[in-house]
Amino acid sequence: MARICLHAYVGGRVQGVGFRQATREEADRLELDGWVRNLDDGRVEVVWEGEEDRAKALERWLGRGPRHAEVSAVEVEQMP
């Protein structure tokens, strides 16, 4: 399976609700590498790399997020 790297901006109520920690836990569960951080504009930025099917699974998960999050937008691009 090919490895891919994805970069996302997640908007909505995604800060102060455990979004970063939950994203790290989901990425670990999917055996992905990467990082996640809060941005000053209220969004969360995520970069991750791994097998394509697992990377796409995290992309789908970001659209829902953890229980207390309210995701309103996810912008994803594939990195070279």
Model feature map: region roles:
Residues M1-P80:
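Intrinsically disordered, low-complexity, mixed-charge
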